Amino acid sequence: RSGDLELYTMNLDGSNVKQITNVLGYDGGAFFSPDGSKIIFRASRPKTDEEVEEYTSLLSEGLVQPTEMELFICNSDGSDLKQITFLGNSNWSPFFHPSGDKIVFSSNYESTMGFPFNIYMIDVDGKNLKRITYGKTFDSFPVFSNDGTRLAFSSNRNNGGNRDTNVFIADWKD
């Protein structure tokens, strides 16, 4: 719609389309907070003139280059936009804890080679980062059960080296 990869909301019937983000860069992977008042998402933001040129050139061809992504949170109408991670590398697949006070997400920020990806938790204000998984491959797409007693995630662990990705469900205790 805008020529950039922005976030929008709309009614289930497709009416009442509203643009939520309006900053150059790739915005995606959005989820609403349990009460519907906030949106958490991943985004890349080209900073230098060279990065802007590369981003817009690829976008004109319908492409996006894998790049650093950070997590952003805003009100469900797009107001009060804040970046909550400043970790570098790829921080993505965010999901709200049922309390609405914390976010689980996947990141490779501790990696120098691009892997592994592990699951982390952070407060919605960007404080109290905590590592949740300690895998050596790929742990991602974390989601909580509605009652907060289980965490499901995808992982390449225990796959016998064949690159299969499986779903794991873990009991969760706050």
Describe the residue ranges of each PLM region:
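A flexible loop/linker signature enriched in serine peptidases of the S9 family
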Residues: R1-E6, T21-Y26, R42-E70, Q83-N91, ...
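A short pocket-lining beta-strand/turn micro-motif at the edge of beta-sheets
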Residues: F117, N128, F138-S140, D147-L151
